């Protein structure tokens, strides 16, 4: 997000494109690389061009969310994900966001969830900082013990405006 504010374009590149000789270093496997630089044209694109799901498709609201909550969710929504899978789902109640991962029919997409969620959380936390919101990311035992049919609980964001 910082590079974006400086007019620098970026793109995450997954493992299949990276040459095999560069995939491992010190017994660690490289998962993703970020390419970045000054674009020929604009590095900005319209939200519709990003082909992201709407907040209504991603969120369940227990009550009408405040404007700052929608802004925070929108930052999470716009995060890039592998193959544009957008695995995150949100249950919003008061000043809490319960974050879930959509279960994948294929393990090929699911293996990227840690990277995808890391990027999404970075977007969310950067937006929260810009809005002067305090956010605690916590794992609630009562939700982590439940079995959900189409989703898996990840974390909860507790916000203090």
Please identify what each model-predicted range represents.
Residues 1-161:
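Acidic, surface-exposed loops and disordered segments
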């Amino acid at each position: 997000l910082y590079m974006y504010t400086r007019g620098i374009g970026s793109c995450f590149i997954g493992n299949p494109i990276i040459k095999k000789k560069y995939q491992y270093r010190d017994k660690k496997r490289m998962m993703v690389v970020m390419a970045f630089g000054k674009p020929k044209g604009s590095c900005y694109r319209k939200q519709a061009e990003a082909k992201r799901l709407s907040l209504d498709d991603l969120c369940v609201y227990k009550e009408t969310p405040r404007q700052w909550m929608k802004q925070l969710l929108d930052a999470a929504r716009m995060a890039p994900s592998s193959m544009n899978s957008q695995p995150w789902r949100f249950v919003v109640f008061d000043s809490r966001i319960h974050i879930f991962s959509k279960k994948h029919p294929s393990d090929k997409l699911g293996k990227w969830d840690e990277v995808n969620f890391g990027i999404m959380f970075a977007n969310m936390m950067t937006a929260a900082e810009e809005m002067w919101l305090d956010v605690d990311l916590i794992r609630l035992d009562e939700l982590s013990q439940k079995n959900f049919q189409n989703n898996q609980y990840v974390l909860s964001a507790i916000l203090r405006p």
